[in-house]
Each structure stands twice: as structure tokens, then as C-alpha cells.
Amino acid sequence: YSSAASDVYKRQVIDLGAGNLASQLSWIYYYLKPSFDKVNPLISKRLRHELQVRILDTYMNEDHFWWMAFHLKPGGLVNNWNPWCNFNVLQCFFLLENDRDKLAKAVYRTMTSVDHFINYTHGDGGCEEGPSYWGHAAGKMYDYLQMLSDGTGGKVSIFDQPIIKNMGEYIARSYVGNGWVVNFADASAKGGGDADLIFRYGKATGSPLMMSYAAYLKSLSDKDDIPSGDPFRLFQTLLSREELEGRSADYQSPSYSWYPETEFCYMTNKNGFFVATKGGYNNESHNHNDVGSFSLYLNTMPVFIDAGVGTYTRQTFSSERYSIWTMQSNYHNLPLINGVAQRFGSEYKATEVQFDPKHMYFSANIATAYPEEANVKKWIRSYRLGKNTLKIEDSFSLDRAERPNQINFLTWGKVDISVPGAVTVEVNGEKV
């Protein structure tokens, strides 16, 4: 028991929980201070004091919180915590701080921090964390940027930057249909996003794709649904809902979406095929060892799937993460090479990644995602989408063959192997 440990309780921490609560309390203080003062002035004084000590002072005087990314090392991770926490802090400063010089310094500090999140994200806008995290990643970044623009009278606005638009459109491009979304990494397989948020983001960045997608999502929901969310999103929805409801729901899934830096590729055709493939590396945010994997949807129904993630536990975010089966490459649509699975780490990645939109063809060398003991020189995994077919081809060269290679396919359908040389998979009436 040390003296340092005995002082831990005195330290203030800004995390998701503290930030969410503080931003809500700041709105409460902003609107209800006169009412509190009529009851007892101590209520608002105590509330203002706690917000000052716990959030405003702590944010300006501390720089060790990992999500701030002020001490980011090469290869370090910046995820949704960054825009989410900074958005909460920005609300607190705009609602509470009356000293213009102090406010300016605080706003600039949040801008410097959020820059690290934007710079971490590839220019193509792909969200490594998946669609179910988009609302907390790009979505919270939009909230932050919108409040920053509003709070500065539009003088500080970067909605015209291509990366911001690309980050927004990811949510529309990752939608398969009937509630299904592409769910690489820890993302959920069902979702679609917050229609009101997506519409506002699309309007701010000039994206017809996002606005039509938002109108489509809204057309699927209860027309009498009550706007909800944190105070800022709630107020924004009240201002934009009527415009959203008046927009035509003419969304159509793009024929393909190619993310050359994130190395995500989605291909569709007019016969109901939707193929999602990836290259990438095995240290992405919410990472699975899944370099080169794919999912296939037929008439919006998942056939070959990504199992996603189970309930989060202590094990999920510990050194034991890759002992969980859903994180391992042998439980993705990938090969075991010489009996060896892919390995975790930034150095285990796809190489020679390419996409040909004219021929709907994606390929990657995934040998570089396997450790040395796999004894593989090259393994080109390719996907070619035809009118009524998806051709998956493995072309490889080994240093030596020690064990039979095993090609894995994950499906939740009924598998029929009764016909020699053929395998049929049926999912809710859809057969491949």
C-alpha cells in the first residue's frame, strides 16, 4: 500500500461515462439555473463547481488520457473515444465557460485532439470498427464538428473536406438490406444507423447518398416515433426532422464501394448478390484476424457470414482476446495453411491488394498475414462477381507442405453434401 495509491481517489477522470453525464448536467445547468436559484442557490453553485473541477479544469490541465492522443506513438490507436469524449467536453465549455480567452484555448485544444482521430482515419473514410460503431465514431465526429461550426458562427468548419464526406458515406455503403449490414471486426450484423443523424451529416457534407439513405431508413420506422438521444442530437433532430420526412426514399445500394486505403471492397449485381471482402491488417480497431475474408449475401440474406463478436467480457479486451474463437482466422472464411492460422499484429497484413471495378474482381496476397511457421511464399485469394456467380480462387506457393491445407467457410445455413463434388447451402429459401 503506497502513498501514491492512497491519492488515487483524488484524481479526476474523463471517460465516456463522465463525459456523457457532464454534458447532460451542463445542459441542465444552462437551462435550469434560474429555477434552481429560486429553490436554493447552492444547487447551481455546487453543480457548476463540480463541472469545473471534474471536466473543465481536468481537460485543460491533464494530457495523459489515452483518447486525447496527445502522446500518440507510431502505430498507436485512435478510436471512437476521441471524438465522443471531445464532443462531450466541447459541450461543457460552450455551455459553461464565459471567459472568451479561456473558451478559445479550450476549443483549440479539442480541435488539436480531434485532429488525431481524423488523421488516424484513412482518407477513403472506411470505419475499421464497423457500422454499429459508426454512430460513435464518425457520428460523434459529426456532432463535434457541427457544434464547433455552430459555436464559431461557421468560421471553423471542415465539412467541405473529402475525408469527412467519405467517413459519413461509409454507413450508407455498408448497408446490405433488410436490416443487414457488413459486420467485419466487432460490429453487429444488424443495424443501419440513426436516420436523423445520417440525414444531418449528409446535408452538411452535400451527400445525396446519405440523405436518400436516411430517408429510406426513416420510411421503415414508426412515423410517430419520438426523437431521442443526448440533448444535442435531440435538439438537432427537432430542427431537421420535418425536412427529412419530406425527402423521397430513393436509396439504392451502390454497384460497388472500394476503400483503397482501408482495403474494404463491396460488390453487388442486379441478381441480388452482395459481396463484402477485405484486405487490411491484423491490428485494426476492434480487430479480428480476418485478412482476406469475405461475406456473401443473396437477396439481402447472409449466406457466408462473419460470426462477429459475442458478449463483451474481461477476456475480450485482454491478452486473451485471440483465444476467443470468433477472433481467430480459422473461424472466418479463410484457409488454415499447413495447419497454421493468421497471427495478431500490425505486421500481419495483406499485400498486393487490388480491385478492378470493370470486372468486379478483388484480390490480395494473404500469405503475409500468416506467421513464418505456415511456410507459405504466396497465397493469392481472389473474388470475382459474375451475373449469377461468385468465383473464389486460391493460388498459392508453399516453401514446403507439412499438413493438408484447410479451406474454411462459415455459414448458418443448411449444408447438403449428398451430391458428389457439390455443396449446397440453403438459408431461409436462398440456395448457393
Stretches with model-predicted labels:
Residues 96, 100, 107, 111-152, ...:
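Long, repeat-rich segments with strong aromatic
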Residues 89, 171, 394:
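A residue-level signal for conserved active-site and pocket-lining positions in enzyme catalytic cores
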Residues 153, 240-431:
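Non-catalytic C-terminal accessory modules of carbohydrate-active enzymes
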Residues 36-45, 101-108, 151-164, 420-425:
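Short alpha-helical "patches" and their helix-cap loops
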Residues 1-5, 9:
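Single conserved hydrophobic/aromatic residue that forms the stacking wall/gate
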Residues 136-304, 355-357:
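Carbohydrate-active enzyme catalytic cores, enriched for enzymes
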Residues 24, 92-95, 113, 144-151, ...:
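Generic, well-ordered alpha-helical scaffold segments in large soluble proteins
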Residues 11-130, 239-248:
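Active-site lining segments of carbohydrate-active enzymes
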